[in-house]
């Protein structure tokens, strides 16, 4: 388990490129036949990926020992979105078939967590966010057909994108975790611009659907002290509450956003005018 400490905004603005990447970038999300796990002190979110290839991958009691409990979800809830081939997640003996871009919310208290791919040649890629939970809401599958896509932006400003809200109060109940998937239209490059911060939530982005020769310049920092991190395909970045989180790519891309905090109202954000950015 890779543990990332919280960092003050005054400290963050003094960091060079390598230090920024070390603090906020998660480079290796998917490793064959393993799970990856990054634990952030910021709202205690856990971020990672699971890619079963030659055999199923189980998250067992070894993780619980690192968290001071018996199992990962003794005091946590889990959200998973599959960005790879078809697969399944077995939760306490019940199999949930999870296809490409299907998602599964897994309840606090679940013990057995096994992840499998249907085909080794096209393995599932289960990306997950895990957050502290105070009560148990039912495990539930969410497919793209269950969400109401919202298209925002304009081709003229290169920010036309479709937002798919998977884990939000209108779709299912969670303790604090929200997740969704935003896809840029072909030829569009900007996400979340004009940008914002949200004092009551932190956020993590996973960028994917990127070609090998492309990248995203992820914008972060306080609005008057902006910095950037160069992102490649299937990499994630941690965004503290005080930081903007926006990006511009060399080509169109898709990203998953996950939020943890005290407020699940999607529009609870502090907008930043473009002319106020520095």
UniProtKB/Swiss-Prot annotation:
Pathway: Glycan metabolism; pectin degradation; 2-dehydro-3-deoxy-D-gluconate from pectin: step 4/5
Positions that bind Zn(2+): 196, 198, 203, 245
Residues making up the signal peptide according to the UniProt record: none
Enzyme class: isomerase
Catalysed reactions listed for this entry: 5-dehydro-4-deoxy-D-glucuronate = 3-deoxy-D-glycero-2,5-hexodiulosonate
EC number, as in UniProt: 5.3.1.17
Single GO BP term: D-galacturonate catabolic process
Top-rank taxon, per record: Bacteria
Cofactor stoichiometry and binding remark: Binds 1 zinc ion per subunit.
Keyword Repeat in annotation: no
Keyword set, alphabetical order: Isomerase, Metal-binding, Zinc
Obligatory cofactor(s): Zn(2+)
Molecular function GO labels: 4-deoxy-L-threo-5-hexosulose-uronate ketol-isomerase activity; zinc ion binding
InterPro entries, sorted: KduI, KduI/IolB_isomerase, KduI_N, RmlC-like_jellyroll, RmlC_Cupin_sf
SUPFAM superfamilies with a match to the protein in the record: RmlC-like cupins
Gene3D superfamilies noted in UniProt: Jelly Rolls, pectin degrading enzyme 5-keto 4- deoxyuronate isomerase, domain 1
HAMAP family: KduI
Function: Catalyzes the isomerization of 5-dehydro-4-deoxy-D-glucuronate to 3-deoxy-D-glycero-2,5-hexodiulosonate.
Family per record: Belongs to the KduI family.
Protein name: 4-deoxy-L-threo-5-hexosulose-uronate ketol-isomerase
Organismal lineage: Bacteria, Pseudomonadati, Pseudomonadota, Gammaproteobacteria, Enterobacterales
Underlying gene: kduI
């Amino acid at each position: 388990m890779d543990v990332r400490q919280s960092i003050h905004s005054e400290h963050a603005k003094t960091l060079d490129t390598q230090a920024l990447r070390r603090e906020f970038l998660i480079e290796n999300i998917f490793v064959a036949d393993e799970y990856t796990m990054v634990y952030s002190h910021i709202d205690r979110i856990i971020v990672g990926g699971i890619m079963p290839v030659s055999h199923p991958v189980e998250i067992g009691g070894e993780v619980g020992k690192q968290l001071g409990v018996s199992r990962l979800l003794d005091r946590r809830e889990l959200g998973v979105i599959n960005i790879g081939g078809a697969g399944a997640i077995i939760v306490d003996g019940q199999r949930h078939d999870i296809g490409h871009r299907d998602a599964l919310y897994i309840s606090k208290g679940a013990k057995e967590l096994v992840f499998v791919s249907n085909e080794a040649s096209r393995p599932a890629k289960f990306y997950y966010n895990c957050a502290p939970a105070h009560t148990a809401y039912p495990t539930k599958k969410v497919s793209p057909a269950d969400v109401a896509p919202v298209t925002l932006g304009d081709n003229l400003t290169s920010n036309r994108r479709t937002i798919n809200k998977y884990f939000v109060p209108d779709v299912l109940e969670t303790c604090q975790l929200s997740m969704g998937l935003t896809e840029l239209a072909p030829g569009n490059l900007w996400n979340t611009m004009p940008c914002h911060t949200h004092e009551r939530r932190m956020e993590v982005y996973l960028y994917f659907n990127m070609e090998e020769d492309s990248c995203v310049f992820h914008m972060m920092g306080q609005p008057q002290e902006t910095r950037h991190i160069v992102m490649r395909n299937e990499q994630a970045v941690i965004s503290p509450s005080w930081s903007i989180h926006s990006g511009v790519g060399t080509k169109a891309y898709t990203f998953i956003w996950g939020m943890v905090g005290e407020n699940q109202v999607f529009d609870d954000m502090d907008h930043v005018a473009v002319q106020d950015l520095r």
